Amino acid sequence: MASLKSIKKRIVSVKNTRQITKAMKMVSAAKLRRAQENVVAARPYAKKLGEVLERLSKSQDVDGSPLMEKRQGGKALLIIVSSDRGLCGGFNANICKAAERFAKERGSEFTELSMMTIGRKGYEFLKNRHKIYKNYANIFGTLNYQTAALIARELIDGYLAEEYDEVYLLFNAFKSVMTQDITLEQLLPVTPEVAAEEEYAPEYIYEPSKAALLDELLPKHIEVQMFKAMLESVASEHGARMTAMDSASKNASEMIGKLTLQYNRARQAAITTELMEIISGSESIKG
């Protein structure tokens, strides 16, 4: 049986760990509220922009754009949005496994498959397994639209220079604190979602022209999709970390209970042994 001193030391250690996990849970909860507000604000804008692009792309007097041009099977780029920090349950492991699954199931469709990682954890997992086109790390602490726009512009430049022919975006979409859905979207070429036909579709007047507006909105659409994916990932990360730290705190409390019981039993056994020794000594003196 472990000594009283070692058991007490373990109890103190687990209590300190529980204090840390509880603090991390509270911090994640505060960050999650802000991140969730950002996601909720970004979703309607991204959806409405997609609807405008869908209407423009169906117009007969618009020839399209190089960003919508489909090329015959070639080089593909997969963007994986992970996190810079750990202690968030299976958040990073799940997204990396999804990237591995994409490479295994669809890699044969392309002449070459490269990966771009956003977040240190994804890069560390994938760097020795796949060709990493580029890595962005330590950007989530000060995440803003300008950062996402910069990445999107670099992707657009690479696509127009034919460095790759298709771009896919893999990220955790935020559903709730307990649920994050791994989502795969095609970023390039842009393929607007086809909405259901309306009985009465209003005819809009576009200025200066539909073609000019399409050329202006397509890069903006890619920027917005990138920014939204990163916001979704940040909210998912905080939700996953909050859940993981809550679970860790509960496990620590259970362990403290078991160790305390073990400590009390050991202490009781030690006291009983001491009493038996005293009684035995007393009996021997009397005898």
Curated annotation (Swiss-Prot):
Note the superkingdom of the native organism.
Bacteria
Query: Which topology term describes how it sits in the membrane?
Result: Peripheral membrane protein
Q: Which GO terms describe its cellular component?
A: plasma membrane; proton-transporting ATP synthase complex
BP-aspect Gene Ontology terms: proton motive force-driven plasma membrane ATP synthesis
Gene3D superfamilies noted in UniProt: 3.40.1380.10, ATP synthase, gamma subunit, helix hairpin domain
SUPFAM superfamilies under this entry?
A: ATP synthase (F1-ATPase), gamma subunit
Keyword tRNA processing appears in the UniProt entry: no
CDD domains according to UniProt: F1-ATPase_gamma (cd12151)
Alphabetic keyword roster: ATP synthesis, Cell inner membrane, Cell membrane, CF(1), Hydrogen ion transport, Ion transport, Membrane, Transport
Compartments (UniProt record): Cell inner membrane
Gene Ontology molecular functions: ATP binding; proton-transporting ATP synthase activity, rotational mechanism
Q: What is its main location?
A: membrane
What does the UniProt function comment say about this protein? Produces ATP from ADP in the presence of a proton gradient across the membrane. The gamma chain is believed to be important in regulating ATPase activity and the flow of protons through the CF(0) complex.
Note the PANTHER family from the entry: ATP SYNTHASE GAMMA CHAIN, ATP SYNTHASE SUBUNIT GAMMA, MITOCHONDRIAL
What's this protein's family per the entry? Answer: Belongs to the ATPase gamma chain family.
**Subunit:** F-type ATPases have 2 components, CF(1) - the catalytic core - and CF(0) - the membrane proton channel. CF(1) has five subunits: alpha(3), beta(3), gamma(1), delta(1), epsilon(1). CF(0) has three main subunits: a, b and c.
This protein's name: ATP synthase gamma chain
Organism, as annotated: Geotalea uraniireducens (strain Rf4) (Geobacter uraniireducens)
Q: Which gene encodes it?
A: atpG
